[in-house]
């Protein structure tokens, strides 16, 4: 939705519907996928498969792999979960390939669910959320795709996500949480560190980011 020029990532997040997500099942699934012959010169190797334990609201399986193309080895991490509250439903997304002049279609989260998951995290975690990429993503997605957001779907997705994570009680106090987050010295320092690390955020003020997040929340209340 954003593109590599706005924020790059070496990770893939996926959710599975209608299947068990355990280490053995995922190992078999990944082995089947990477063994498909496509003759593109890319080789995938699984290095490690483990349960995700670091973030309670994102239980699932993490696959650490490396890819090799033309002698260059690149690490790749894939997180697979199940039971995410995709609201109202997943959508087909056309993804343009980097090395071929064609696109492929994938099932993806709708924009409103992507925003809802990140917005819920900002509200419920408040000043304990150290993932500045969540804040940046909310801002850039609202700037690039704001006209495409359906308020009713955003509201439904936010409620569904909070219900699944057991954080509905925090939604009513979101404005106060936003004020606390914006004023917190540690959060400001984290944002400055993020700006120094990632040039795409260098000219983006903390206040501007938080204003975008407030606007998204108000849109969800329409």
Write out the residue ranges for each language-model feature.
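Structured mid-to-C-terminal alpha-helical surface segments
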Residues: 2-6, 12, 17-222
């Amino acid at each position: 939705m954003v593109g590599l020029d706005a924020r790059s990532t070496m990770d893939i997040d996926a959710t599975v519907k209608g299947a068990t997500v355990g280490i053995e099942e995922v190992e078999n699934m990944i082995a089947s996928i990477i063994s498909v012959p496509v003759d593109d010169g890319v080789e995938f190797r699984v290095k490690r498969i483990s349960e995700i334990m670091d973030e309670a609201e994102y239980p699932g399986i993490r696959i650490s792999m490396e890819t090799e193309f033309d002698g260059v080895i690149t690490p790749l991490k894939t997180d697979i979960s199940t039971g995410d509250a995709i609201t109202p439903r997943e959508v087909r997304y056309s993804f343009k390939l980097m090395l071929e002049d064609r696109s492929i279609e994938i099932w993806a989260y709708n924009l409103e669910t992507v925003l809802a998951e990140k917005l819920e995290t900002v509200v419920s975690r408040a000043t304990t959320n150290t993932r500045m990429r969540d804040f940046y993503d909310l801002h850039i997605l609202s700037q690039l795709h704001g006209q495409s957001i359906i308020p009713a779907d955003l509201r439904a997705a936010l409620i569904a996500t909070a219900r699944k994570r057991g954080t509905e009680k925090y939604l009513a106090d979101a404005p106060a949480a936003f004020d606390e987050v914006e004023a917190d010295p540690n959060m400001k320092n984290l944002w400055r560190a993020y700006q120094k690390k990632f040039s795409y955020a260098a000219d983006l003020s903390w206040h501007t980011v938080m204003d975008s997040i407030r606007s998204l929340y108000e849109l969800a209340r329409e």
